[in-house]
Amino acid sequence: MWRNSQKWKNRASRRPQRKGEALIDKLWIFRGLDRGRMTKKTLLMHELIGLKVKVVKSSHPGLIGIEGYVIDETKNTLTILGTKVWAIPKIVAEFEFEVGDKKIRIKGEELVGRPEMRLKKR
């Protein structure tokens, strides 16, 4: 389709429109073993993408119970892939990360900030 001498992109109905939708219902193994080195303190300085996560507490009742894998992280949000793709604000939620056989709870307020800067913190 043409408009103002520019061709529009074809938005096919089967093409994913949001980031991560192509990954839904696919089996993925995101992380290996942490070898017992992951604690609450080290998780704050760690890469979160690929970890299994669950929202255990939130000021918005519709967010409680969402679980899946972290597929993207920004300064203020975590993008979680489960039965669908959610963008969860960090500031309003408390997360439970599953690392190996351990479950680590972290308030979202502790995670707020650019991921690359959080990794540099000591």
UniProtKB/Swiss-Prot annotation:
Organism placement in taxonomy: Archaea, Methanobacteriati, Methanobacteriota, Thermococci, Thermococcales
Disulfide bonds: none
The keyword tRNA processing belongs to this UniProt entry's keyword annotation: yes
GO terms of biological process kind: rRNA processing; tRNA 5'-leader removal
Similarity annotation: Belongs to the eukaryotic/archaeal RNase P protein component 1 family.
Origin: domain of life: Archaea
Task performed by this protein: Part of ribonuclease P, a protein complex that generates mature tRNA molecules by cleaving their 5'-ends.
Subunit details: Consists of a catalytic RNA component and at least 4-5 protein subunits.
Protein's recorded name: Ribonuclease P protein component 1
Enzyme category, top tier: hydrolase
Enzyme Commission numbers on file: 3.1.26.5
GO cellular component terms, semicolon-separated: cytoplasm; ribonuclease MRP complex; ribonuclease P complex
Localisation per UniProt entry: Cytoplasm
